[in-house]
């Protein structure tokens, strides 16, 4: 049981233990011209792709789903590119650098939600939906209320994730490039808007694919050079790391991340079910032609991400040997220059020199751009498709819907820049944890039960979904992270850092209770419609494929 709890505790988002690069003050580094030049090459190339994509975006289908013409392999790379953030790359490597073996369990925790997506969600989501997961949730339920709830859940998750990414972008670029924080935030915001505004999902997908390839190449090269240093022997790798690490043999012992069983379960559930409720990830399943390609997308994405997180483990131990024991990378006080999250960046310099250091720094920036572009498109589609076209102005033309979507992109971009500047010196690490908790407590229960439970009604979905969302937010505010560390109170009202265990339970219980007690004629009609939905979800009958889907 203790091993299980250890593993579950390790599945929390990077924000809890690996967020020093995205929270508080950072030590600005000298201007890195190699990194800036390489990043400019990446920007010019991706803007060229955006121009190419803009010539092919002629309809709503093209803008939201790239015309449904992305292959399973391409989509798998894009999903991996959307999910593998710069903070997970630097943060997990830093956790292995400081804690050893626990970092491996931690990195594997990022994958626990993907079997759920593969076996329970991907195919049915593609067969039932068109542009957003709200299409699936509202398939047999009342369009208006369900779309409002789904859009609110999406927008809250997107907003929290976007703030964390923008602040993280500013901090990381200040660390890696030596650029001013405000310049970095504005640069990320402007590029993000350009990708999404002109290229839509097609440009966003290819930016994410390129970023994934660059990140996988860079991490593979670093891991190869580390293993070459130890004669391609894991025994030598671990022995040398234990010999130079201050904790010695203790870095090979698990369990250092466990606080208590409730926190472990709550964190584990939050990441596992939260992944299956992230709107910018779910949107990718509508970019492929059919359910078979959607399933292949998850298969490839899981493979790429699993490989990547194994590499971060090798990189972390390599940093212990080649960076931790090298005084060149320490300041006068004996601490790592720039903080522990710079371990992977310093290792890039140690194994590949200044040129490769510039490459890894540019890849870290590209990683942020790929993630924020996906978030922005998900937020814009929630407003334009779910709210505008299906609630506030039913029957809106494609042109009107696309105009609203692009206006939303501009508004989201400006808001993201402003909030990124305002939160510069705030501890925003909790925001990613809260985003996962809300995705797990509001989005995931509604998606899952709308596809699998025949007795679900609009009444149950609405009351249970809102209860889950509100519970997650309230418990997070009353918990130690916000109530004590940010608001300055002496003791937290809610004793646990992450609320997912409780808010998910409230959501599922609420959905079951209010659906089971719904005796209305509308509820009976919605239950009867489940059979037709089930047939389509299993067979794909009635789903248009390719460009016209």
Swiss-Prot record:
Keywords associated with the record: Cell inner membrane, Cell membrane, Ion transport, Membrane, Sodium, Sodium transport, Symport, Transmembrane, Transmembrane helix, Transport
Periplasmic topological domain: 1-32, 99-102, 169-182, 235-263, 321-358, 425-427, 485-493
Pfam families: SSF
InterPro entries in the record: Cation/Ac_symporter_ActP, Na/Glc_symporter_sf, Na/solute_symporter, Na/solute_symporter_CS, Sodium:Solute_Symporter
Cellular compartments annotated: Cell inner membrane
One GO location term (cellular component): plasma membrane
Annotated transmembrane regions: 33-55, 76-98, 103-125, 146-168, 183-205, 212-234, 264-286, 298-320, 359-381, 402-424, 428-450, 462-484, 494-516
GO molecular function, one term: acetate transmembrane transporter activity
A Gene Ontology BP annotation from the UniProt entry: plasma membrane acetate transport
Main location group: membrane
Membrane topology designation: Multi-pass membrane protein
CDD domains the UniProt entry points to: SLC5sbd_u4
Cytoplasmic side: 56-75, 126-145, 206-211, 287-297, 382-401, 451-461, 517-549
Function: Transports acetate.
Homology family: Belongs to the sodium:solute symporter (SSF) (TC 2.A.21) family.
Protein name from the UniProt record: Cation/acetate symporter ActP
Organism: Escherichia coli O6:H1 (strain CFT073 / ATCC 700928 / UPEC)
């Amino acid at each position: 049981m203790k091993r299980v709890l250890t593993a579950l505790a390790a599945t929390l988002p990077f924000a809890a233990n690996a967020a020093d690069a995205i929270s508080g003050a950072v030590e600005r580094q000298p201007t890195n011209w190699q990194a800036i030049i390489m990043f400019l090459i990446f920007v010019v190339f991706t803007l060229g792709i955006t121009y190419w994509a803009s010539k092919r975006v002629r309809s709503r289908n093209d803008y939201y789903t790239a015309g449904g013409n992305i292959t399973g392999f391409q989509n798998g790379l894009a999903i991996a590119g959307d999910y593998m953030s710069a903070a997970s790359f630097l943060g997990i490597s830093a956790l292995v650098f400081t804690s050893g073996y626990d970092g491996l369990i931690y990195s594997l925790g990022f994958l626990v939600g993907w079997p759920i997506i593969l076996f329970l969600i991907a195919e049915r989501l593609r067969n039932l939906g068109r542009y957003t997961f709200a299409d699936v949730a509202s398939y047999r339920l009342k369009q208006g209320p369900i779309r409002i709830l789904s859009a609110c859940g999406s927008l809250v998750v997107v907003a929290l994730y976007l703030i964390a990414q923008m602040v993280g972008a500013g901090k990381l670029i200040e660390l890696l490039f030596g650029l001013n924080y405000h310049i970095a935030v504005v640069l990320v915001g402007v590029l993000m808007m350009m990708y999404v505004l002109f290229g839509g999902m097609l440009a966003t997908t290819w930016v994410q694919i390129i970023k994934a390839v660059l990140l996988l190449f860079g991490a593979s090269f670093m891991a190869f050079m580390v293993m070459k240093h130890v004669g391609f022997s894991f025994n030598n790798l671990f022995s040398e790391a234990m010999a130079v690490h201050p904790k010695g043999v203790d870095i090979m012992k698990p369990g250092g991340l466990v606080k208590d069983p409730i926190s472990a379960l709550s964190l584990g559930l939050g990441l596992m079910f939260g992944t299956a409720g992230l709107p910018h990830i779910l949107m990718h399943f509508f970019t492929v032609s059919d359910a078979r390609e959607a399933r292949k997308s998850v298969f490839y994405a899981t493979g790429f991400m699993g490989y990547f997180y194994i590499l971060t483990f090798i990189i972390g131990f390599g940093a212990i040997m080649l960076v931790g024991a090298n005084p060149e990378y320490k300041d006068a006080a004996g601490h790592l220059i720039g903080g522990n999250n710079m371990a992977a960046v310093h290792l890039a310099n140690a194994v590949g020199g200044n040129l490769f250091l510039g490459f890894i720094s540019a890849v870290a920036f590209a990683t942020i751009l790929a993630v924020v572009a996906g978030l922005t498109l998900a937020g814009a589609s929630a407003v334009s498709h779910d709210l505008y076209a299906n609630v506030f102005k039913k029957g809106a033309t494609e042109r009107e819907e696309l105009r609203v979507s692009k206006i939303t992109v501009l508004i989201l971009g400006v808001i993201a820049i402003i909030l990124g500047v305002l939160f510069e010196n705030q501890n925003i690490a909790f925001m990613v944890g809260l985003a996962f908790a809300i995705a797990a407590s509001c989005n995931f229960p509604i998606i899952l039960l709308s596809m699998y439970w025949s007795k679900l009604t609009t009444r149950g979905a609405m009351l249970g979904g809102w209860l889950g969302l509100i519970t997650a937010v309230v418990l997070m505010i009353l918990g130690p992270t916000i109530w004590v560390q940010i608001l300055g109170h002496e003791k937290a009202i809610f004793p646990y850092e992450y609320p997912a265990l409780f808010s998910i339970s409230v959501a599922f219980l609420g959905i079951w209770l209010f659906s089971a007690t719904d005796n209305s004629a509308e509820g009976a009609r919605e239950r009867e419609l489940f059979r037709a939905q089930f047939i389509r979800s299993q067979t794909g009958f009635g789903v248009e494929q390719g460009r016209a889907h």
